[in-house]
């Protein structure tokens, strides 16, 4: 709401003033009151409401009675609720004192011209511009909250442009307007008022760097009609009244929430009195709206899949075919990045994370490009960015990145409740070192970005013990029809040793791992008994289990998980250069497409014609209604310290829950 305006009246001549509908105007009569005045009378024409507040301690009263005791502490407030057609008046009469020497009454006359001015936007997140809402200065989270939403216009609707839309000062195609939020300036009042008054739309210099405004100045079907009026180097704009009572503006975000930017952007419209050529303009009224830039939102593997991405390289034809078949069963679109574009970089999960942004009027996917910058670095920008598909990235200025900055180290949980707090969009998970220890961590610019989105508060896990150092090496999430609606498969050396011990007990100690591996001469078979007699392997996996157990407790605490929500998947690790890598293909590093799971084929011990590791995983996951498909990734991925999840990526359906309804 605008600050209360003060108007001073005079006994010498009538006073003229402009007021805004619904906004209080404080009338100062004290400077003109005859000395000794004890009473006064006040009259308002129809449509003018006058209120008297006798003192600070007492509530104001409507001036129904015409005569009032005069007190220097009294306040006189005038309100009009509809625009003027003619000048309305308020008249003050001051009887002179002493009464035995009567003189003519003293009069003060106030002529009022009322104008209605509102700056409106979609404050209730209902897809319409609401002019009846009161508190536009606050942006309030929650199901009963309010405030308008702004999308970062980070897609590329115009195929004639090589840049994202927010890099352009022009509207290149009309589809671009669909990504913007509408802001409407409504004015009602005598046309003559605007001969010596003007309206100025303005924002702060900081907010001008974070949003851009276009004014619709002509035919709606012409791109040239949309004039860039605010944003970047433009902080104010005198609004011409092209359309009389209603001017439409289109607003686009330029920056996602980040360190130093909460996501809030504010715009004001101010009515200025420009009637005196000898003086500068004076403000009469300001209306304000606040937008929040929509956060980038990740989707967990439990969300329905829409599109699967995979790279074709020189030795993974069978792998690509297997992923294509799984995508077909799941009803997903398949996008294959050819070798000419990936230049033999197969790690498409590490290159990017697919999420989305949402406003009441529009939702579209946004790819977050990692700072790893391998041979795939151009793929997200050149091949994914396009109409209604946005792009974002964060890179440290000194280019100091580690393996932990690849996005295999970036996951998100399904919706959870932890410690009495709801996380309806889940929580982001990424890995680092132990608190207070030296080691690899996710680069600060990425951490700042993820924390600033607010709606999926991050949890940091301990992954520095892993050679690659990604959270997807030790956990995943799969959908379930009971409980919390999901399970968390977690790598477990203890479960693997227990399984092997059972098989050895039943006389299968000679069963071999790695039988049937095709196309690689570096792998020697090893029996169950050899594994169970390898003291260094057992000792190292006890250490690995302790690291996983640390994460297990963090996840139980931060995600509100119980033991029944965790599925222990048998998995062993070995040491290379003092870090852990998977001993056999990492079973939790899976591709989740609804009920269809693409799991790395472990080449485990074959007993009675069946791989005992595959059989165990099926027994754990298929009762949940899931279908397990084991994909041979041994040579093209496992031998390079990656698996199925590392070599694929998935665009998923956005949450049905609206982010502005949550309470961070």
UniProtKB/Swiss-Prot annotation:
Main location group: cytoplasm
Catalytic reactions on record: L-arginyl-[protein] + H2O = L-citrullyl-[protein] + NH4(+)
Enzyme class label: hydrolase
Enzyme Commission number(s) from the entry: 3.5.3.15
Record flagged with keyword Glycoprotein: no
Cited function: Catalyzes the deimination of arginine residues of proteins.
InterPro entries in UniProt: Cupredoxin, PAD, PAD_C, PAD_central_sf, PAD_N, PAD_N_sf, Prot_Arg_deaminase_cen_dom
Temperature dependence: Optimum temperature is 37 degrees Celsius.
Keywords carried by this UniProt record: Calcium, Cytoplasm, Hydrolase
Keyword Protein transport belongs to the record: no
A Gene Ontology term for the protein's cellular component: nucleus
Localisation: Cytoplasm
GO MF term set: calcium ion binding; protein-arginine deiminase activity
The encoding gene: PADI3
Similarity remark: Belongs to the protein arginine deiminase family.
Xref: Pfam families: PAD, PAD_M, PAD_N
Cofactor(s) essential for the protein: Ca(2+)
Post-translational modification: The N-terminus is blocked.
Protein name: Protein-arginine deiminase type-3
Tissues and organs where the protein is expressed, per its UniProt entry: Found in wool follicles, keratinizing epithelia of the ruminal mucosa, embryonic hoof and tongue filiform papillae.
């Amino acid at each position: 709401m605008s600050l209360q305006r003060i108007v001073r009246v005079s006994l010498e001549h009538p006073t003229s003033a402009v007021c805004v509908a619904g906004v209080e105007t404080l009338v100062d009569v004290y400077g003109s009151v005859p000395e000794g005045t004890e009473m006064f009378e006040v009259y308002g024409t129809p449509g003018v409401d006058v209120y008297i507040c006798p003192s600070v301690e007492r509530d104001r009263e409507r001036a129904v009675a015409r005569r009032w005791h005069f007190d220097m502490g009294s306040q006189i407030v005038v309100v009009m609720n509809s625009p003027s057609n003619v000048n309305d008046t308020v008249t003050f009469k001051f009887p002179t004192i002493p009464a035995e020497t009567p003189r003519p009454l003293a009069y003060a006359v106030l002529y009022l011209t009322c104008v209605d001015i509102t700056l409106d936007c979609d404050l209730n997140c209902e897809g319409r511009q609401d002019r009846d809402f009161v508190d536009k200065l606050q942006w309030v989270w929650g199901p009963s909250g309010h405030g308008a939403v702004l999308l970062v216009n980070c897609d590329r609707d115009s195929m004639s442009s090589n840049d994202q839309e927010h890099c352009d000062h022009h509207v290149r195609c009309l589809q671009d307007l669909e990504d913007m939020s509408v802001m409407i300036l409504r004015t009602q009042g005598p046309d003559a008022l605007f001969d010596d008054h003007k309206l100025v739309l303005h924002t702060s210099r900081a907010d001008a760097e974070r949003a851009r405004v276009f004014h619709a100045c002509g035919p709606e079907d012409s791109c040239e009609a949309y004039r860039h009026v605010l944003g970047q180097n433009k902080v104010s704009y005198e609004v011409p009244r092209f359309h009389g009572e209603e001017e439409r503006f289109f607003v686009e975000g330029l920056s996602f929430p980040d360190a130093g930017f909460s996501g809030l952007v504010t715009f004001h419209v101010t009515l200025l009195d420009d009637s005196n050529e000898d003086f500068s303009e004076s403000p009469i009224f300001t209306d304000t709206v606040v937008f929040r830039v929509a956060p980038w939102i990740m989707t967990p593997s439990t969300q329905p899949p829409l599109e699967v991405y995979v790279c074709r390289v020189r030795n993974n034809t069978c792998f690509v075919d297997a992923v294509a078949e799984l995508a077909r069963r799941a009803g997903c679109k398949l996008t294959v990045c050819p070798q000419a574009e990936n230049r033999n970089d197969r790690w498409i999960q590490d290159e990017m994370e697919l999420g989305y942004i949402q406003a009441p009027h529009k939702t579209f996917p946004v790819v977050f490009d990692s700072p790893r910058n391998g041979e795939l670095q151009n793929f997200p920008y050149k091949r994914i960015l396009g109409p209604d598909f946005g792009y974002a990235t964060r890179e440290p200025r000194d280019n100091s990145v580690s393996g932990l900055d690849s996005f295999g180290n970036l996951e998100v949980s399904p919706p959870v409740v932890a410690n009495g707090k709801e996380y309806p969009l889940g929580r982001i998970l990424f890995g680092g070192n132990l608190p207070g220890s030296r080691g690899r961590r996710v680069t600060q610019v990425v951490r700042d970005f993820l924390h600033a989105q607010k709606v999926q508060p991050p949890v940091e896990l301990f992954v520095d013990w892993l050679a690659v150092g990604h959270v997807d090496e030790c956990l995943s999430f799969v959908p379930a029809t009971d409980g919390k609606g999901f399970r968390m498969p977690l790598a477990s050396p203890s479960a693997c040793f227990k399984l092997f011990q059972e098989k050895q007990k039943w006389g299968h100690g000679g069963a071999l791992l790695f039988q049937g591996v095709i196309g690689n001469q570096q792998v020697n078979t090893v029996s169950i008994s050899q594994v169970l007699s390898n003291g260094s392997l057992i000792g190292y996996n006890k250490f690995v289990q302790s690291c996983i157990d640390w994460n297990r407790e963090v996840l139980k605490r931060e995600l509100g998980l119980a033991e029944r929500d965790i599925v222990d998947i048998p998995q062993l690790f070995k040491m290379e250069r003092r870090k852990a890598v998977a001993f056999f293909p990492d079973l939790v590093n899976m591709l989740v497409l609804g009920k269809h799971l693409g799991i790395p084929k472990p080449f485990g011990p074959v007993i009675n014609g069946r791989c005992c590791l595959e059989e165990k995983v099926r027994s754990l996951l298929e009762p949940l209604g899931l279908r397990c498909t084991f994909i041979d990734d041994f040579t093209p991925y496992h031998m390079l310290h990656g698996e199925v999840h590392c070599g694929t990526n998935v665009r998923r359906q956005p949450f049905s829950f609206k982010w502005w309804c949550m309470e961070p």
